[in-house]
């Protein structure tokens, strides 16, 4: 989960701390098992379940796609007194730099490959092994006589509901035309213009939403955060929209865990008040809410009184990753130095043989 406090510092539950800067600096704030996790990061993040890798997107200029991987031991160094580490510690493994205009938001595994929503290009991109990004899907509405328009953010194509293939996936956007004001501009009229695109047809399959985010397949249904009205909705293949739950805040961030869906809410940024016609800004809270998938009942909430924005939520099994490099409450410089000096990933081979 990614959140931002009123002072502008970002806090992330269950992920490492990342400060996004033009140089792409990466550092960490850890958690201790059994304690409330709190740390920080940029916007989208995604777990690659087959390998246990965590991918985190920073949307600063340049964009940076970080890869983090669990370390389960120390290298057999003769200059160390410590012989091991406790648990599976999430450590930095790589970074990929992309133009700031890519404007990465959501990340998702579609089939075996990592994909991202390149909001600045009105497209979905894949990330080839050799670096960079490659456009692999875009809605037909950006195509004209001169080809597809990847040069301006026309749609705010920000969310991915990942299926087994692009054709089986769905994507959210704030509108489906290239006319008039664009998302991000204050004069952009938002109410009822949001859509869900079908990956198969590249056309809207659902209309009437307001600044939708975080589409996810929950059980056998497609759930979407209808942010401008502070709700979570279930969208049918026939274009129908059913309200599942109403919450006190700008809904964004959605993750299913067992029989619950965890939904994030954020405060309204004052200059974007017009983007939330269905909300009362003074009543909005920054928090996480557990929604019963069958009934839509909110069974529990965790609210940060000084919080501001939540961007994304991802569940990471503790058997894959059970702690982070640093304990924010009890720092241990010697152990931290040893960990960064000689950590070993579970997939590492000490000797390469021909």
Model-assigned labels for residue ranges:
Residues 1-354:
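Sequence-structural signature of mature extracellular/luminal beta-sheet repeat domains
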């Amino acid at each position: 989960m990614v959140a931002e406090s009123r002072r502008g510092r970002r806090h992330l539950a269950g992920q490492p701390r990342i400060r996004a800067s033009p140089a792409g600096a990466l550092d960490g704030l850890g958690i201790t098992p059994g304690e409330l996790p709190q740390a920080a990061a940029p916007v989208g993040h995604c777990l690659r379940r087959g390998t246990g890798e965590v991918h985190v997107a920073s949307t600063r200029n340049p964009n940076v796609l970080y890869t983090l991987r669990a370390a389960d031991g120390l290298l057999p160094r003769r200059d160390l007194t410590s012989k091991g580490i406790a648990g599976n510690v999430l450590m930095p493994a790589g970074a990929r730099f992309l133009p700031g205009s890519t404007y990465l938001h959501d990340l998702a595994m579609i089939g075996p490959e990592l994909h991202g929503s390149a909001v600045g290009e009105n497209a979905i991109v894949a990330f080839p092994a050799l670096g960079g990004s490659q456009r692999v899907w875009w809605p037909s509405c950006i195509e004209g006589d001169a080809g597809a328009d990847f040069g301006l953010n026309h749609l705010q194509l920000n969310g991915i509901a990942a299926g087994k293939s692009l054709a089986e996936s769905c994507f959210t956007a704030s509108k489906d035309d290239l006319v008039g004001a664009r998302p991000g501009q204050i004069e952009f009229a938002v109410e009822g213009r949001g859509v869900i695109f079908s990956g198969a047809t590249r056309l809207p399959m659902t209309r009437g939403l307001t600044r939708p985010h975080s589409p996810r397949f929950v059980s056998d249904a497609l759930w979407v955060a209808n942010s401008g009205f502070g709700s979570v909705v279930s969208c049918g293949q026939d274009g129908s929209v059913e309200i599942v739950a109403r919450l006190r805040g700008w809904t964004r961030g959605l993750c299913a865990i067992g029989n619950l869906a965890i939904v994030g809410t954020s405060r309204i940024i004052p200059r974007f008040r017009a983007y939330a016609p269905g909300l009362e800004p003074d009543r909005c809270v920054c928090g996480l809410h557990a929604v019963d998938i069958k009934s839509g009942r909110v069974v529990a909430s965790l609210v940060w009184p000084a919080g501001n924005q939540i961007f994304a939520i991802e569940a990471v099994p503790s058997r894959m990753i059970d702690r982070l490099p640093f304990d924010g409450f009890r720092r241990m410089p010697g152990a931290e130095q040893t960990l960064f000096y000689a950590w070993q990933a579970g997939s590492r081979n000490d000797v390469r043989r021909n």
